[in-house]
UniProtKB/Swiss-Prot annotation:
Transmembrane segments: 30-50, 96-116, 128-148, 176-196, 234-254, 283-303
Homology family: Belongs to the binding-protein-dependent transport system permease family. MalFG subfamily.
Domain of life of the native organism: Bacteria
Annotated membrane topology: Multi-pass membrane protein
Protein name (record): Probable ABC transporter permease protein MG188
Species assigned in the record: Mycoplasma genitalium (strain ATCC 33530 / DSM 19775 / NCTC 10195 / G37) (Mycoplasmoides genitalium)
Domain spans labelled ABC transmembrane type-1: 88-303
Length: 329
């Protein structure tokens, strides 16, 4: 009897349990989740289905749902638009080129923060590199406008060239794309460095100690321990960069004038959608939105599966190497 009383006396009561351990009615966590759910439904799901409906419809009236008819004519008109083709080219090239540069530069800087600087300075350097992320986007855009100014820009002055980056007057030029690319890589660098450096600091330090005992140099430890350990983080960042790259919106570099961006080679899919909505061409805007969605999904699937394909090829190469070594003995 005494043991039973002692056992039940030591058990925690409901008031002593943590918040996550206490039984809660369904409506309490649902109320916390409800704002995010409503935001997603109102600003993501409903607009997506409206875009789907307008992209395959021949009726240009956004609110007239009674006379809708299925048609692919909108997509035919879309791909015959030269502005859309140029925007598609710029968005795809931006996403393709900015992805490796953003990841590689962020990995190098994060490695320097984690492995070079002392522990007391890690937080300081993380804060320094994260400052651009919290800086006003308008201020950053104005700074880059001065950097790429063709008359007295910093870039042309330093390299003693006269390249017209943002005011070339040609829709087909790649000069504006390079300016947008540099601006985008720098803008995303702060967030990427913070995420990758945090992932590197979470790697088990015992792995490095064991590797040091096995005479593995820091470079080998980086490629054999650090990179495989942060692979989920790299896949996550890759997905974000793909989506962000396809949705590039360089309007701020052209003084918020869509016509200036298009006339000087700074068009993109998202900018094209913005222009069509301003003009009231909801069918073309909906079709372009669907094309952007399909391209983003396909591009993301190809790159994500590429990671697994590379791992599978590495495993097969190691397997063949081991089998070859066994046959020699």
């Amino acid at each position: 009897m005494f043991k039973w009383l002692l056992k039940h006396h030591n058990q925690p009561h409901s008031l002593q349990l943590g918040l996550l351990d206490q039984p809660l009615p369904f409506w309490k966590p649902f109320l916390l989740f409800l704002p995010a759910l409503l935001t997603t439904i109102l600003f993501t799901i409903i607009p997506f289905f409206l875009s789907l409906q307008k992209g395959f419809s021949a009726n240009s009236d956004l609110y007239d749902l009674s006379s809708q008819s299925f048609s692919l004519r909108t997509f035919q008109d879309l791909f015959s638009e030269s502005n859309f083709v140029l925007g598609l080219r710029n968005s795809f090239l931006y996403s393709l080129i900015s992805l490796p540069f953003s990841i590689i530069i962020a990995i190098v800087i994060a490695s320097a923060i984690v492995f070079v600087y002392k522990k007391l300075l890690r937080g300081f350097w993380q804060t320094v590199f994260f400052l651009p992320y919290v800086t006003s986007g308008v201020a950053i855009s104005i700074a880059f406008v001065y950097i790429f100014d063709s008359a007295s820009g910093i870039l042309n002055t330093v390299f003693n060239v006269n390249t017209k980056w943002l005011d070339s007057g040609s829709r087909d030029t790649f000069n504006a794309l390079w300016a947008i690319l540099i601006f985008g890589v720098w803008k995303n660098l702060a967030f990427n460095v913070l995420i990758i450096s945090t992932a590197m600091l979470s790697v088990n330090p015992q792995l490095y100690k064991v590797a040091s005992l096995d005479s593995a140099n820091p470079v080998r430890q980086f490629f054999k321990i650090t990179l495989p350990s942060i692979r989920p983080t790299l896949i996550f960042l890759t997905t974000l960069l793909i989506l962000g790259g396809m949705q590039v919106f360089p309007l701020a570099l052209f003084e918020n004038k869509p016509e200036e961006a298009v006339a000087n080679g700074g068009n993109s899919i998202l900018l094209y959608i913005f222009q069509q909505i301003q003009s009231g061409n909801t069918n073309l805007a909906g079709a372009a939105t669907l094309v952007l969605f399909v391209l983003g999904v396909c591009y993301g699937l190809v790159l994500r599966n590429g990671f697994y394909l590379i791992e599978w090829l590495q495993w097969k190469i190691k397997q063949l190497y081991v089998q070859k070594q066994l046959t020699l003995y």
